[in-house]
A protein has these predicted regions:
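Solenoid-repeat scaffolds in large eukaryotic assemblies
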Residues: 98, 167-168
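Membrane-water interface segments at the C-terminal ends of transmembrane alpha-helices
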Residues: 1-88, 116-143, 168-187, 211-239, ...
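Flexible interhelical linker loops that connect adjacent transmembrane helices
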Residues: 189-218
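Juxtamembrane membrane-water interface segments that cap and precede transmembrane helices
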Residues: 106, 243-247
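Glycine-rich helix-loop "coupling/hinge" segments at transmembrane-helix boundaries
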Residues: 42, 137-163
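Short helix-to-coil transition segments within interhelical loops
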Residues: 90-117
């Protein structure tokens, strides 16, 4: 998903609003995970806007499906951001040579874009693994039992339910070691600027809206709706809530 979305964003990078959209794709690193999880429940939960789609296929958000959706939503916008950056980092000379040789479509993707994407895949996979490995809220909310667990949840259970501090410390130590190993792998791989768009000059001309790109626009729209619908759902439910002002000025909220 990240590769396809990044490719489409890069292909239509001259459309107004694409740059702010790309910059906003880092939102999953800023927002608390619980907000995304609550947004997913608002969309796909038992009383969610799109729950009827899951019912058609006899699917339930509470289980492995919810865990997968949550982690896809938490990771694919950021992955898209990284891949888009790698495409922007391709030198002007490479784009110029490709255009001179008449490359386009799949040939251009295979010759220029794919090598740029391929070299950062190990870095992206390492980053996603670390984020999923340390996941807590999505697994404990959608998993709801011992069938789905992570080290984070095992530590939580050891402290809260078993009162076994030795076990919790041992699990935490194992988690630190594993994270350090993958962090070292990440640091020794290609350095990527996650939050700054490249200023490299990319060959191309500004494109106008065209009927031949309808399929691209539809895919972009689907990706955007999928990525941002949980946030929109949270905002809408918050605005419509009659208790919003009461909670906002409550003593517990002000203390927090």
């Amino acid at each position: 998903m990240g590769i396809l979305f990044a490719h489409l964003l890069f292909k239509h990078r001259y459309i107004h609003g694409i740059d702010p959209l790309v910059n906003f794709l880092s939102f999953t690193f800023i927002l608390p995970t619980i907000i995304i999880v609550l947004g997913i429940i608002s969309i796909y939960g038992n009383s969610g806007y799109l729950n009827y789609i899951l019912k058609i296929f006899d699917l339930n958000i509470y289980g492995i499906l919810g865990i997968i959706i949550a982690h896809v939503l938490l990771n694919f916008p950021f992955v898209t951001r990284i891949i888009f950056q790698s495409l922007m980092d391709v030198s002007y000379d490479e784009w110029s040579l490709a255009k001179h040789n008449g490359l386009g479509g799949f040939a251009l993707f295979k010759t220029i874009e794919w090598p740029a994407i391929k070299k950062i895949i190990p870095t992206v996979l390492t980053m996603v693994f670390i984020l999923c490995f340390m996941s807590f809220a999505p697994v404990i909310i959608f998993g709801g039992g011992p069938n789905f667990s992570t080290l984070e949840i095992s530590i939580y259970q050891a402290l809260l339910f078993e009162y076994d501090f030795t076990k919790a410390i041992n699990l935490a130590f194992i988690q630190i070691i594993i994270c350090l190993i993958f962090l070292l792998i990440f640091l020794f791989q290609n350095k990527i600027s996650f939050f700054t768009l490249s200023e490299n000059r990319v060959l191309g001309t500004k494109k106008t809206y065209s009927i031949k790109y309808v399929s691209d626009y539809l895919l972009l729209l689907i990706f955007i709706i999928f990525a941002f619908s949980p946030l929109v759902a949270i905002v809408l439910e918050g605005i419509q809530s009659p208790k919003l002002l009461k909670i906002a000025f409550s003593k517990s909220f002000l203390i927090a």
